[in-house]
Amino acid sequence: MSSIGTGYDLAASTFSPDGRIFQVEYAQKAVDNAGTMIAIRGKNGVVVVADKLISSKLYTDNANPRMFNVNDNVGVAVAGNYPDGFALKNYAYGEAMKWLKDYREPMPIQNIANSVAEYIHIHTLGISRPFGAGAFFMSWNKQTGGRLFLVEPSGLNYEYKAWAVGKHRQAAKAEIEKLKIEELDVNQLVKEAARIIMVVRDENKDKNVQIEMGWVGEQTNGKYEEVPSEVVTAAEEWAIAKLDEDDMDD
């Protein structure tokens, strides 16, 4: 069968003869071609890192962040089309607030991820344009440890130990697989994540980019937080020194 839509890509409700929904595949490409984002679950927390494009020097610092709180204990990081990702974040936040109002307790991370996945599926099923964004959800507590979910533009929802999305996702996954992530604490994960982002960057194309990080773990008392700028800077400096050291060894 042809990989070209040939008329079957005009609506998200239309299957091709070989069972594909081209509109959803196109939405996935919006994530696949976006800046690299990786999320890693370590021994005492979860870290997510995005290589964010800064398209203008006139932007204020940290304009258009990719990472947010859903509630105090769950963070979300959106990849792909920014307005679509922001809409998914708002939906997740609204669901968490309704849960808190109804049950007087924070909405569990798996319920949040499942709710967003179902929303994406129903939205697409209703012959609307698919969301061109994916969303990582992360949490940590003493009972369950770290948890990490990714909801994709198709509505698929999986739990991961670590994962990467974006244009350098395959190279990033290969680097992650070299690490014994279950032995690393969040401070070590921050450094290694910064190193991975720098390793997979295309020096000729990936210019005007900025690393954005979020974490949740034992040291944050289970609260999702943005990684302080001084910690990010220190991680970048460590990563540069590590890469220079590796180059000298080679």
UniProtKB/Swiss-Prot annotation:
Its main location: cytoplasm. Pfam families: Proteasome (PF00227), Proteasome_A_N (PF10584). SUPFAM superfamilies: N-terminal nucleophile aminohydrolases (Ntn hydrolases). It is found in: Cytoplasm; Nucleus. It comes from the Eukaryota. Keywords: Cytoplasm, Nucleus, Proteasome. GO terms for biological process: ubiquitin-dependent protein catabolic process. PROSITE patterns: PROTEASOME_ALPHA_1 (PS00388), PROTEASOME_ALPHA_2 (PS51475). The keyword Cytoplasm applies. The keyword Cytoplasm applies. GO terms for molecular function: 3'(2'),5'-bisphosphate nucleotidase activity; identical protein binding. One of its GO terms (cellular component) is cytoplasm. The 26S proteasome consists of a 20S proteasome core and two 19S regulatory subunits. The 20S proteasome core is composed of 28 subunits that are arranged in four stacked rings, resulting in a barrel-shaped structure. The two end rings are each formed by seven alpha subunits, and the two central rings are each formed by seven beta subunits. The catalytic chamber with the active sites is on the inside of the barrel. Belongs to the peptidase T1A family. The proteasome is a multicatalytic proteinase complex which is characterized by its ability to cleave peptides with Arg, Phe, Tyr, Leu, and Glu adjacent to the leaving group at neutral or slightly basic pH. The proteasome has an ATP-dependent proteolytic activity. This is Proteasome subunit alpha type-3. The gene is pas-7.
